[in-house]
Amino acid sequence: CNVLAMLQKLGHQTAFIGKVGQDAFGRLLVDAVKEQGIDTTGVRYDDNVHTTLAFVQTAADGDRDFSFYRNPGADMMLTADEVDLSLVRNAKIFHFGSLSMTDKICENATKHAIAAAKEAGALISFDPNLRKPLWKSMDDAKEKISWGLSQCDILKISDDEIEFMTGEKDIKTGVKKLIDEY
């Protein structure tokens, strides 16, 4: 939601589509998103699965380390039928990340939304947002991120993600590889 919050602060209308558990954490997250002025009509609640929890620790060098309580998490359970297509079709830019493709159910919902956004003429924005503990394998992560790269008009990517996708430590060389491939 960081991208949405920043766009909202710049005066743009934003909306979030996703799923949280019908629990205190889910309500807290939705309230925090609403406080940023982000439309939450696309949020769905799951009575049977808890909200995914993420814990972030900052190391002395400033690097972040993530731990997750998930598997399943409510975000993984968003189905294509639950995607609010009116929000998608009204978007000028549709932003997504790879975490919405870690499981088949939410991957189908993501692909459904992207197809609708493209059909409506929206630009597609993608943030790989690689969180290694959430993937079954790094091959699966690479495959899904590669698909996301092939779909996007706008890319928000980190140095680590460039290296992960290209094998290049040099950012300029890695970026060139991404441009050439996608």
Regions found by a protein language model. Give the residues of each.
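Active-site beta-loop-alpha junctions enriched in small/polar residues
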Residues: 71, 99, 129-133, 160
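Short beta-strand/loop segments at the ligand-binding rim of alpha/beta enzyme cores
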Residues: 121-128
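Conserved phosphate/ATP/ADP-binding segment of small-molecule kinases
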Residues: 120, 134-182
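Conserved N-terminal subdomain of the carbohydrate kinase-like
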Residues: 13-96
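Alpha-helix C-terminal capping segments
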Residues: 2-13, 58
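Anion (oxyanion) recognition and catalysis
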Residues: 8, 34, 115-119, 149
